[in-house]
């Protein structure tokens, strides 16, 4: 993997800097590194493809070295270099795509394609290593089963989940009380509702709670907490739990009271925030517990009192809600990130070449299914294909 990254870094620099008119002295070190790459690769044969609809391609390396010049690089010099660069870039692109289409239940962190395995040979160690990539660093750590640390701006750690629970219900579904929520990616929205606006509740207060276990622990998280759940702020028709009927939800939004957010790790409370909105920080957690209340307004104007009568029918439904967004966090596991295209790149390549479903990844790289059942085998394979995708992104946009 280090060889693949070093080749890509050298090629990227060469493509950007070996241009007509450049002083040779400004790129002499790069050209020496480029020539070392050619010397190491010459005489080697590789094969890529052959899985799904990806064509088999054979690669042969027999290129001349770039020479020295006293002055600027001329058009002939650059054209000669470009021919070599383009072949190497095409090779790297195909090696990366070949690697992204393969998976293994055992040793999924190790190279799976023939071409990348061959590059693990001792002779390729002569290529100048550049391990400055976070992904290369973490691939090395994961490969040695050491502690890794991944920084994601918006970690897609929450499997998609959208449902409701009813704490009070009737066959007619005309006086309901409960919670509904949607969890996805890095955002949680939860709403508590009561058709009677807590009229018969103790002290006219309804208590709601929503607990969200994460698939992996997060640390040093920056989080936004808002006293609203906009996805549950408009009328809708909802299928009943048994699927035999539908019921009507017509929310009128109130501000939640006594809001408390707890961040837990292995069942122990690490951070707690009460009635605090905006930006909050969570140090270390694998579970989020949200609790809040719906309080019937003690004083109401006639217009508001008409919204919340003391007896049925209840046309409008009192609703309170919260939105919690994980803006950034550190995670020791491999996760798709809203600010990166790695998952999209891997998925698109696998779709383009109609890669058959293997033993590790779900059909279509369905992220909800993948993160819901996030096994060590899946994590190893994700680490490898995301590393390769990050390498490919240096050369192929």
UniProtKB/Swiss-Prot annotation:
It comes from Rotavirus A (isolate RVA/Pig/Australia/CRW-8/1987/G3P9[7]) (RV-A). InterPro entries: Capsid_hemagglutn, Rotavirus_A/C_VP6, Virus_capsid_a-hlx_vir. Signal peptide: none annotated. The lineage of its organism: Viruses, Riboviria, Orthornavirae, Duplornaviricota, Resentoviricetes. This is Intermediate capsid protein VP6. Homotrimer. Interacts with the inner capsid protein VP2. Interacts with the outer capsid glycoprotein VP7. Interacts with the outer capsid protein VP5*. GO terms for cellular component: viral envelope; viral intermediate capsid. It is found in: Virion. The VP6 trimer contains a zinc ion located at the center of the molecule. The zinc ion is not essential for either trimerization or transcription activity of the DLP. Zinc-depleted VP6 has an increased sensitivity to proteases.
């Amino acid at each position: 993997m280090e060889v693949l990254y070093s080749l890509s870094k050298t090629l990227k620099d060469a493509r950007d800097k070996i241009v007509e008119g450049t002083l040779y002295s400004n790129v002499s070190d790069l050209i020496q590194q480029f020539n070392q790459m050619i010397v190491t690769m010459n005489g080697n044969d590789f094969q890529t493809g052959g899985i799904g609809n990806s064509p088999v391609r054979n690669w042969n390396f027999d290129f001349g070295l770039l020479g020295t010049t006293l002055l600027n690089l001329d058009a002939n010099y650059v054209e000669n270099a470009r021919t070599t660069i383009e072949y190497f870039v095409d090779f790297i692109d195909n090696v990366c795509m070949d690697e992204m289409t393969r998976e293994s239940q055992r040793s999924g962190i190790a190279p799976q394609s023939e071409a990348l395995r061959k590059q693990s040979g001792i002779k390729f160690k002569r290529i100048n290593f550049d391990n400055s990539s976070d992904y290369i660093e973490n691939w090395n750590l994961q490969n040695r089963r050491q502690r890794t640390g991944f920084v994601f701006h918006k970690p897609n750690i929450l499997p998609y989940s959208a449902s409701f629970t009813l704490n009070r219900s009737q066959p007619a579904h005309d006086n309901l009380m409960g919670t509904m929520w949607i969890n996805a990616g890095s955002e949680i929205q939860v709403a508590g509702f009561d058709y009677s606006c807590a009229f018969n509740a103790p002290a006219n207060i309804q208590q709601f709670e929503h607990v969200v276990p994460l698939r992996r622990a997060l640390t040093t998280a920056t989080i936004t907490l808002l006293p609203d759940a906009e996805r549950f702020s408009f009328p809708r028709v909802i299928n009943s739990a048994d699927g035999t009927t539908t019921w009507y939800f017509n929310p009128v939004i109130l501000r939640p009271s006594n809001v408390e957010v707890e961040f837990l790790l292995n069942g122990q409370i690490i951070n707690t925030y009460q009635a605090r909105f905006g930006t909050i920080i969570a140090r270390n957690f694998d579970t989020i517990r949200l609790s809040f209340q719906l309080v019937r307004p003690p004083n109401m104007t006639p217009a508001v009192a008409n919204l919340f009568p003391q007896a049925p029918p209840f046309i409008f439904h009192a609703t309170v809600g919260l939105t919690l967004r994980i803006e950034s966090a550190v995670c020791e596991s491999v996760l798709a990130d809203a600010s990166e295209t790695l998952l999209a790149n891997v998925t698109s390549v696998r779709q383009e070449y109609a890669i058959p479903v293997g033993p590790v990844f779900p059909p279509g790289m369905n992220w909800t299914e993948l993160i819901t059942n996030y096994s060590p085998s899946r994590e190893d394979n994700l680490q490898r294909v995301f590393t390769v995708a990050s390498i490919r992104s240096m050369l192929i946009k």
